[in-house]
Amino acid sequence: MLSWVVTFLIIALIAGILGFGGLAGASVEIAKIIFFIAVILFVVSAVVGLLRGRTRV
């Protein structure tokens, strides 16, 4: 649980530096790209999980 606290603290510090440093526009675009990559990976993972689950049954 402590590792999650440290992880979110680091993310918050980086977001604060980028937000208050004037790089908010660039960080928004990067966040959009990372979000869509994460959604695509989630969908691929879900489909692969469903296909593997059906073959074992």
Curated annotation (Swiss-Prot):
Entry membrane topology: Multi-pass membrane protein
Keywords tagged on the record: Cell membrane, Membrane, Transmembrane, Transmembrane helix
Domain of life: Bacteria
Compartments (UniProt record): Cell membrane
Gene Ontology CC terms: plasma membrane
UniProt keyword annotation of Cell membrane present: yes
The keyword Phosphoprotein belongs to this UniProt entry's keyword annotation: no
One Pfam match: DUF1328
Cleaved signal peptide residues: none
InterPro entries: DUF1328 (IPR009760)
Disulfide bonds: none
Transmembrane portions of the chain: 4-24, 30-50
Family: Belongs to the UPF0391 family.
UniProt protein name: UPF0391 membrane protein Nham_2738
Species the sequence originates in: Nitrobacter hamburgensis (strain DSM 10229 / NCIMB 13809 / X14)
Lineage, uppermost ranks: Bacteria, Pseudomonadati, Pseudomonadota, Alphaproteobacteria, Hyphomicrobiales
